[in-house]
Structure formats: structure tokens, C-alpha cells
Regions:
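Hydrophobic transmembrane alpha-helical segments in integral membrane proteins
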Residues: 16-39, 139-141
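Structural signature of hydrophobic alpha-helical transmembrane segments
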Residues: 26-35, 85-97
Length: 143
């Protein structure tokens, strides 16, 4: 069966199926790259002794939109999948992914010094770790 043909199979049958792209495919990679770029950007602002500004808010909004899509895609995949994995843990990590950047921004925005920007940088650095952890939980036990 060709890869293109596998891509159109529905529902997803397990962790090796090509339909799991929202959790393990290019979409997750985009989230990781965007989060790392934002972290570097935030650390540049920290080094320049700058507080959080609207430009970093715009970047955080893009990341948040990607993470909401990750949450929705992950839940849809979970509901249409037949393989065994820790579903509550999976949803917990997905929800945490969506909540961490806004929490970091509220905290960082309230601190109008470079420390506030550092809080944002840490929140952005947490995202790649969380995405990889979602992928590990999706893969199931023994993966």
C-alpha cells in the first residue's frame, strides 16, 4: 500500500498509521520549531534588558493557535484510534500544552522587567518537551 493511500485511511489504526500526523508528524514539528524560535527571541529580549512587548505577544498567540489545533487533533485521533495508551495522561498533557503559554504570558506581562521576559522564555522552552511527551504517551507502553 502506498504512503498516499495509507494517508487517506480512516479511522487511525494505531501508532504507526500515517493518520497520526497531528501528534507525531510535521504539525508537531512546527510547534516545536515555533516554540524554540520564540524562546530564542525572548532570551534576546532578556539580554537586551527589555520587558515583554506586543511583538512577543503576537508570537505567543501564533503558538497558542497551533497548540489549540494540537489539542483538537490529538483528541480526535484518540477518539478514532484503537490502540492502547494512557488516554487520561495524553489528554492531560495536551491540555497543559494549551495552558502553559497563557499562564507564562500573564505572569510575564505582570512583571514589567526582563524577569517577565525570562518567564516567557521558560514557558516557550517547556513546549517542545511537552510535545515530545505527548508523542511518547501516544506511542503507548514500551515505546
Amino acid at each position: 500500500m502506498s504512503v498516499e493511500h495509507q494517508w487517506h485511511r480512516w479511522p487511525a489504526r494505531g501508532p504507526t498509521d500515517a493518520r497520526i500526523a497531528a501528534v507525531t508528524g510535521p504539525y508537531a514539528t512546527v510547534i516545536i520549531v515555533v516554540a524554540l524560535v520564540l524562546a530564542v527571541w525572548a532570551f534576546v529580549l532578556v539580554a537586551a534588558n527589555r520587558p515583554p512587548n506586543l511583538s512577543i505577544l503576537a508570537g505567543a498567540a501564533v503558538l497558542e493557535a497551533l497548540l489549540v489545533g494540537f489539542l483538537v487533533g490529538g483528541v480526535v485521533q484518540m477518539l478514532t484510534s484503537h490502540h492502547s495508551f494512557a488516554k487520561a495522561e495524553f489528554v492531560g498533557y495536551l491540555v497543559a500544552c494549551v495552558l502553559i503559554p497563557p499562564a507564562g504570558f500573564v505572569w510575564g506581562w505582570g512583571e514589567k522587567t526582563r524577569s517577565g521576559t525570562a518567564v516567557l522564555a521558560v514557558a516557550f522552552l517547556i513546549m517542545p518537551v511537552m510535545v515530545v511527551r505527548v508523542q511518547q504517551v501516544w506511542a503507548g507502553p514500551g515505546a
